[in-house]
A protein has these predicted regions:
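Conserved class I S-adenosyl-L-methionine
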Residues: 63-74, 212-239
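Class I S-adenosyl-L-methionine-dependent methyltransferase module
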Residues: 84, 88-163
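A C-terminal cap/extension of S-adenosyl-L-methionine-dependent methyltransferases
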Residues: 164, 263, 272-322
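A short acidic, Gly/Pro-enriched loop at the edge of an enzyme's catalytic core
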Residues: 170-182
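A short SAM/SAH-binding and catalytic strip from SAM-dependent methyltransferases
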Residues: 180-194
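A short glycine-rich, Lys/Arg-flanked "PGG" loop and its adjoining helix->strand segment in the class I
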Residues: 197-212
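Acceptor-substrate binding/catalytic loop of class I
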Residues: 244-258
Length: 322
């Protein structure tokens, strides 16, 4: 049996348990190693954060005052990277509390190690040395302290101007019209279309008139990362009925294509400023017998497996009705 099928079956089974996220964490830590915070993974995440920030600076020519990340995950790498580059007010939101105190201390220690090795600038060209030094001191203090878990992780993060919240955008009315940069990193592909529409609408409501949104979307089959024998288009061969048997709440993949996302952006009041999409080859797609649902898509949209999209509010022109 293909290893991706084993992983999918395991996560499908785990999703039925009350403590599914805890069980899935054990599975990822002990069996798949996907929660190992290696230097390469850390640098990759920091680079992504830098790219979100560069998208804003390219359009607005300055640092954003207020940043909102959707989808914190286990490790607050991107918010910490934004802090290191000079951002002052950073909010990070997750609908499920995945991050633990030990995850935060591991992240701080890993970033501090890169600082000691002089490697932070590889991923963060705009890193501020004084902030990196302060982060390193905090990491050392937490490592030395016998009460390393006594300080609430949210308190530690606030020391870097980072506000960690669990819930939905509805719990953040205080940000309405204030967010300069909103961003997500490999999040949208794990949401249903209706959930994406609700999220994008909420981000549009919170966005400042001059705000910018930056989204990294991984449109490919995520099981291809785990099992190199399958291509990123593998999941396009399944009908919706069959895919629903494979898909799980713990690792939901919508299979939406880039053209679907474009429509969702437009429908929720956003205008695409930049789109940088990576496409595979016809040879890579050829072995996949497309399900009828995907046969109607243009080939150039089907081939997209990753995309960086930068948006700004689609404001009505002066003199036009609201």
């Amino acid at each position: 049996m293909a290893s991706w099928i084993l992983k999918a079956a395991t996560q499908k089974a785990l999703s039925g348990f009350p403590a599914s996220h805890t069980l899935n964490r054990f599975f990822q830590e002990r069996l798949t190693g996907t929660l190992d915070l290696t230097p390469d993974r850390l640098l990759d995440q920091l680079r992504r954060g830098a790219r979100h920030l560069q998208a804003y600076r390219r359009i607005r020519g300055r640092l954003p005052g207020t940043v909102l990340e959707v989808g914190t995950g286990w490790f607050p790498v991107i918010p910490l990277g934004l802090h290191l580059c000079g951002c002052e007010e950073i909010y990070t939101l997750d609908r499920t509390a995945l991050m633990r105190h030990d995850d935060l201390t591991r992240t701080l220690s890993a970033v501090a190690a890169l600082h000691r090795e002089g490697r932070l600038a590889e991923a963060l060209p705009d890193v501020q040395p004084d902030r990196a030094a302060r982060l390193s001191r905090t990491a050392e203090d937490l490592e030395r302290s016998a009460k390393r878990n006594a300080t609430d992780l949210a308190t530690v993060l606030r020391g870097f101007g980072i506000h960690y919240q669990v819930g939905t955008l509805d719990a953040m009315p205080f940000l309405e019209g204030r967010v300069d940069l909103s961003l997500s990193n490999s999040v949208l592909e794990h949401l249903r279309a209706a959930e994406i529409e609700s999220l994008l609408g909420g981000l549009r409501r919170l966005s400042a008139a001059s705000g910018v949104a930056s989204h990294f979307i991984d449109c490919g089959d995520h099981y291809a990362v785990f099992d190199r024998r399958v291509e990123v288009y593998n999941f396009l061969k399944f009908s919706d009925t069959v895919w629903s048997l494979i898909n799980s709440r713990l690792h939901y993949q919508s299979r939406l294509r880039i053209s679907d996302y474009r429509r969702l952006f437009e429908a929720t009041g956003w205008r695409i400023v930049e789109e940088a999409s990576q496409r595979g080859t016809l040879a890579a797609l050829a072995p996949t017998s497309l399900s009828p649902r995907f046969q109607a898509y243009r080939l150039e949209d089907l081939l997209v497996y990753r995309s960086w999209v930068t948006l700004e509010p689609n404001l009505p022109e002066a003199g036009s009705p609201p």
